[in-house]
């Protein structure tokens, strides 16, 4: 079974292009609940090509949920298989002349990141560890939730097993709090 990668994208564009995108997405979703090889192409309004879905779209499937926010904006989110649908977002931005700001996360495979594009051009493509991503997104709220989780039941054998990208983002005080929570969980 696939690890699900959660994708969230804020999309802006002209009313006409968003109307066309929305229509094509609705048609593709009538056939099945997930976008697959053929339906990715249907949403893009392009003929089916040869290729491997991971390379062409970023993921094998995408359970796309669309919510229109205004005439010129909306949110597209949902799970995909193993990896983000960044390349699909880039293609959407190119076909429909959209500006897309997206985030993705997958705790099981330990990554999260940001991917932005406009009119087919990538402006941001940053991937980091899952804990680092969550800390950057939520700062102290995530940190203290993690501390409570560690104190209750830590699956790490030693503090050295923790994510070094995440640890590097912490202040010295936070590092000390993390060590104390870890030691408490291990009764050290």
Q: Which residues fall in each region the model found?
A:
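Intrinsic low-complexity, intrinsically disordered or marginally ordered coil/linker segments
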Residues: 1-188
